Amino acid sequence: MSRLSIHPEGNTNATSPAEPLLESDDPAVIKAELAKRGIEFQHWPAKVKLHQNSIESDILAAYAVEIARVQADGRYPTVDAIRITPDHPDREALRQKFLAEHTHAEDEVRFFVEGRGLFCLHIGAEVLQVLCEQNDCINVPAGTRHWFDMGSKPQFCAVRFFDNPEGWIASFTGDAIAERFAKLP
């Protein structure tokens, strides 16, 4: 189940965090709270059961209709799919890279086809932790400071939309704030 936790940016540390300002697993509350901060959050049906050996082209073909709908306005001409499993050879290196606070010059749009991941958005004096699960689509606007945790045993597949043909390009902030917040097990 999707979940939102809003914390003060001055969280003490990951093992004894400050009390959250808000916690909810109500989809309407999650959508409304994120919308107040310029973040789009939607539920799309992940209607295709993918084979465990599905490759990127299979995933993109399975969701061709949804991809075409998003790309129709021309904002996101580039799309790919990422699938990380507990046996992925680069899972730990990828986790560490995504855990560092960063921004993008373009929106970060992710549709979770399978599994889950934790987006942490550093907006003003707050950190919003958004647990995204299958069927969730999140659009993090360009320039938003954030990090992503896939957990120590990741199991997710997401379709990623880009307005940049080069795909995922991050500008790391150098802020160690992510170390003060809980991560996925």
Swiss-Prot record:
Q: Where does the record place the site May play a role in metal incorporation in vivo?
A: 101
Q: Where is this site: Important to generate the dianion?
A: 110
Where do the annotations place Fe(2+) binding? 102, 104, 108, 146
Q: Which residues form the signal peptide?
A: none
User: Which GO biological-process labels does this protein carry?
Assistant: L-methionine salvage from methylthioadenosine; L-methionine salvage from S-adenosylmethionine
Give a yes or no for keyword Disulfide bond in this entry: no
Q: Name one Pfam family in it.
A: ARD
InterPro entries found in the cross-reference section: ARD, ARD_bac, RmlC-like_jellyroll, RmlC_Cupin_sf
Binding residue positions for Ni(2+): 102, 104, 108, 146
Keyword Transmembrane helix carried by entry? no
User: Which residues are annotated as site, described as May play a role in transmitting local conformational changes?
Assistant: 107
| Region annotation Disordered: where it falls in the sequence | 1-23
Q: What's its EC?
A: 1.13.11.54, 1.13.11.53
In which pathway is this protein known to take part?
Amino-acid biosynthesis; L-methionine biosynthesis via salvage pathway; L-methionine from S-methyl-5-thio-alpha-D-ribose 1-phosphate: step 5/6
Tell me the keywords, alphabetical order.
Amino-acid biosynthesis, Dioxygenase, Iron, Metal-binding, Methionine biosynthesis, Nickel, Oxidoreductase
GO MF annotation terms: acireductone dioxygenase (Ni2+-requiring) activity; acireductone dioxygenase [iron(II)-requiring] activity; iron ion binding; nickel cation binding
Catalytic activity reads: 1,2-dihydroxy-5-(methylsulfanyl)pent-1-en-3-one + O2 = 3-(methylsulfanyl)propanoate + CO + formate + 2 H(+); 1,2-dihydroxy-5-(methylsulfanyl)pent-1-en-3-one + O2 = 4-methylsulfanyl-2-oxobutanoate + formate + 2 H(+)
Gene3D superfamilies linked: Jelly Rolls
So which cofactors does this thing need? Fe(2+); Ni(2+)
**How many cofactor units bind, and how?**
Binds 1 Fe(2+) cation per monomer. Binds 1 nickel ion per monomer.
Enumerate the HAMAP family for this protein: Salvage_MtnD (MF_01682)
- Its quaternary structure? Monomer.
Function (record text): Catalyzes 2 different reactions between oxygen and the acireductone 1,2-dihydroxy-3-keto-5-methylthiopentene (DHK-MTPene) depending upon the metal bound in the active site. Fe-containing acireductone dioxygenase (Fe-ARD) produces formate and 2-keto-4-methylthiobutyrate (KMTB), the alpha-ketoacid precursor of methionine in the methionine recycle pathway. Ni-containing acireductone dioxygenase (Ni-ARD) produces methylthiopropionate, carbon monoxide and formate, and does not lie on the methionine recycle pathway.
The similarity annotation says: Belongs to the acireductone dioxygenase (ARD) family.
Q: What is this protein called?
A: Acireductone dioxygenase
